[in-house]
Amino acid sequence: MFKRNAINWLEKWKIKNNRKPLVIRGARQVGKTSLVKEFAKQFDDFLYFNLEIADDLVLFSKEVSIDTLYEMMLAVRRKTKSIGTTLIFIDEIQNSSLAIKMLRYFYEEMPHLYVIAAGSLLETMLNKDVSFPVGRVEYMALRPCTFDEFLGAMGEDASTYISPTAGFATG
């Protein structure tokens, strides 16, 4: 994984006092999942759920309390509550309107947890009877890599391509 500038934004989100769950939007294959998995290395515990996988989606098949949902998440991943930092990542969240709804309760009742959700088709959910937790989540749009990110992935930087005398006639 090459360094994405968005990591810096995630690090600022992590230290916010009144941090809300984060919803990362973006087209398919722009690196949402890879970005969050790289960011997850900064946490003591990481719980990853991909709602394209039936065993993960079943967690959101019935409405339960946020405490019960968190206990179920821990049990499914064979983890216990941590005194350290825990990042919960719900990938492909557009597959469950209940998962979207539960983001509100992570914010209101479990603010000590770091929660990120990602999806590529979230705009299509607006046409359905889905209640997005307005004011209780933050959004971030992830785009394809920038030129600087591309150069970094190639082991180069922009100074290789930009001459301090570019644009000036000589002789």
Residue ranges of each PLM-predicted region?
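Conserved P-loop NTPase "ATPase switch" module shared by AAA+ and STAND
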Residues: 80-99
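Pre-Walker A adenine-sensing motif
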Residues: 1-17
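Hydrophobic anchor at the beta1->P-loop junction of P-loop NTPases
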Residues: 24
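Structural recognition of the conserved hydrophobic beta-strand(s) that form the central parallel beta-sheet
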Residues: 89, 114-120, 141, 150
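Short glycine-rich substrate-engagement loop in P-loop NTPases that contacts/grips substrate
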Residues: 51-84
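Conserved lysine of the Walker
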Residues: 32
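Interdomain motor-coupling "hinge/lid" segment immediately C-terminal to the ATP-binding subdomain
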Residues: 127-171
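Hydrophobic positions on the alpha1 helix immediately C-terminal to the Walker A/P-loop
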Residues: 35, 39
